[in-house]
Structure formats: C-alpha cells, structure tokens
UniProtKB/Swiss-Prot annotation:
Taxonomic placement: Eukaryota, Metazoa, Chordata, Craniata, Vertebrata
CDD domains: LPLAT_MGAT-like (cd07987)
Protein's pathway: Glycerolipid metabolism; triacylglycerol biosynthesis
Record key words, sorted: Acyltransferase, Cytoplasm, Endoplasmic reticulum, Glycerol metabolism, Lipid biosynthesis, Lipid droplet, Lipid metabolism, Membrane, Transferase, Transmembrane, Transmembrane helix
Positions of transmembrane segments: 43-61, 66-85
Name by which UniProt lists this protein: Diacylglycerol O-acyltransferase 2
Segments on the Cytoplasmic face: 1-42, 86-361
GO biological process: diacylglycerol biosynthetic process; glycerol metabolic process; monoacylglycerol biosynthetic process; triglyceride biosynthetic process
A Pfam family annotated for this UniProt entry: DAGAT
Amino acid sequence: MKTIIAAYSGVLRGTGSSLLSAVHDLPNIPWLSKSSVVRHLQIISVLQWVLSFLILGVACTAVLVYIFCTDLWLIAALYLTWMVLDWNTPYKGGRRSSWVRNWAVWRYFRDYFPIKLVKTHNLLPSRNYIFGYHPHGIMCLGAFCNFGTEATGVSKKFPGIKCHLATLAGNFRMPVLREYLMSGGICPVARDTIDYILSKNGTGNAVVIAVGGAAESLNCRPGKNTVTLKQRKGFVKVALQHGADLVPVYSFGENEAYKQVVFEEGSWGRWIQKKFQKYVGFAPCLFHGCSFFSSNSWGLVPYANPITTVVGEPITVPKIEQPTQKDVELYHAMYVTSLQRLFDKYKTKLGLHDSEMLEIV
C-alpha cells in the first residue's frame, strides 16, 4: 500500500520515475505476489461452494418470492413454470454439463486442501456400480470434488464410467440450486433415481452414496475414523436387485476439514439433532473451520488438510431381483471386509499410525 501511495504522490509531483519504480515493485508486495493471489483464489473457490451448500437454495427461494412481488414477476413465473415442467429430470439422471464440471474454480478448490483421487483397480464400462463413500464428514468435500467435478480427473482414471453423486432429494426442490447440482452430475439419493440410473441408463454408471448419511456426520471429528455401516444394508439390496457391483471408497482426511461440537447420546443437543433429522432429512451440525483471513480464527472455510479418496476393489454382485435377507447379509459382510481391508492397506501410506483402527458402528 505504501508503494502505491508513493507512486500516486510521484504522479502529483510530475515525476514519472516514481510511477515506473512503483510498478516495478508491485510483484514484491506480499498480497500481490503470485502465490498469495493463487491462495486467495483457492480460498474463494472453497468458500463459494460452502456457501452454496449452506444457503444457496434458501437464498434463491427468497429471491424468487421477492421477484414475484415486483414488476419483474413474469421472469419468476416463467422460471417456476420451467421448474414444474422439469421437476422429474433430477430423478432420471439429471442434466450434467461437462463445461461446468471442468470449471477452473474446481481446480482451485482441489488445490486448497489438496484433494487427490487414488485408483486401485480398473472398472468395466460394461458394468454398473454403487460406490459406498466413507466417511460422510460435514459436507462430503472429497466426494464432491472427486465425483461431482473433473478436478481430479475421475473420467480419465475410470474411462467409460459416469459418476452420479447422490445427495438429499430436498436440494432439488430449491430453485437455481437444483440446476447447479444437476450440472455436476449430482442426483437425489432416492430409490426411484438409483433404480433409473442402474436399469434404464445403460451401463458404465456409478452411483456414489455417502452410506453413513446424517447419522455419520453427527459423529465426525478430527482424528476419528468412525463409519456408520452395521445397519446400513439398503444399498446392498439395491445392488443385488440390479446386479451392480459394490465398490468401497474411503476418504482419508475428510473428517479433518472441520471441528465439530459432538453432543453425547441422551443430551439435549443430540435430541434436537435427531428430531431435526427425522422431520427435515438432515441433521444440523455445530461446526467451524477457519476464517477467510486467518487459519487461527473461526469461520466457515474448511481447514486446509489433505483429503485423499481411495477407490477400492469392486465386489462382483449377481443380479437377484428378490434377494433374501441371507443374500443381503452375505454381500454386506463382504463389503464391510473389503472396506476394512482398504483402510488398513492405505492408512500408514496416508499419514495415520499403524495402531489406528477403523471403527464401524
């Protein structure tokens, strides 16, 4: 700032040398250095997604209602008509955009942490898959970056495979947010949607499901490797009904992105969270990251800890239209074993101690 003021003073005095000298010194100003600019772009890219995740749907709904009360009401009416006519599109595979998935903003998003995608086995385009993503974390940051964008090159690492990241169906009832999500290939985590993708959308599809859901997000915290899986068997039944192979996916570092106040079972805080989850579909978490300006103060920006998502070995699943409980239990046990093996194989390679264990609840 002193350099800029000095340059301006030089201009007022009529000395061009001061201006030229100031321009020459601009790269030496800390907040104008290339690395600083890039870092701030990374923070902005992450913050825009966090704010989109938290408030875009509600904000756009409020704006739409406001526009209805102005002279521009026709614009809101036309969009609402389009939204009604297009209501079922998210449930039929959505409307992905390669252009949006390849935005430069997602590469800045990736590099902030950074986020990496590790491929362990090839996937056949002639098969369909269900990816079980663990852990959920607060916002599934690794899942979004790896499977909702092309920032880590998922389509190049798994050629012929089209990933469909599944999220709460309620998000697709929100104006503008629904278009934003669909452009990334994101779909509702609804039975009708998954059935459509796995049976009427050809082959080479991979539905990515955060199996632990809201219950798992309530228990996530730095240093903990806990997944909610013991009673989560619906995704296995769906895989059997469609003959879709199961693929365990573990994201090391997902739980390090935010710090959360975890309420104990039986506490008033946990009671409120469970009631909210029951009636609304998701659980409110009391969490914080760092601020835009400093990693030492609280804010909504996640902590810049590495997130490495490892895609495990696919489990071949036969097509059984009416699987028995025994069938479901068998393939669920195989899935749990495969996930445990994946965690144990990569934990020391990705910074965890050999003594750290995966807790399955």
